[in-house]
């Protein structure tokens, strides 16, 4: 799952909460530039992309939790089912 946050501090806090609440086994954070339309203007914002590694069965709980803790009015929450190497999946499965 992928979401974004406005600051590294918020992104790091979100990552720690997701792992503590056992909604994710690993969270990656990287700085990005986003260009988008908002209120009829084209905006450019520096923000932080958060990639959340989790189990498919936790998707709904994860989405609900992200909606509660995000700082955005309209949060980006993207999800897709991925295939992965079995050792990684086993680690993910045992960690959550």
Regions found by a protein language model. Give the residues of each.
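Positively charged, small/polar-rich N-terminal and surface patches that mediate targeting and assembly
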Residues: 1-96
């Amino acid at each position: 799952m992928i979401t974004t946050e406005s600051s590294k501090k918020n992104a790091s806090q979100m990552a720690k909460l997701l792992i503590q609440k056992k909604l994710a086994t690993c969270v990656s954070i990287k700085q990005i530039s986003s260009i988008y339309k908002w209120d009829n203007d084209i905006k450019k914002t520096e923000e932080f992309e958060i990639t959340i590694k989790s189990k498919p069965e936790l998707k709904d709980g994860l989405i609900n939790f992200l909606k509660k803790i995000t700082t955005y009015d309209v949060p980006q929450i993207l999800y897709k089912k991925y295939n992965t190497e079995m050792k990684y999946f086993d680690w993910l499965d045992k960690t959550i």
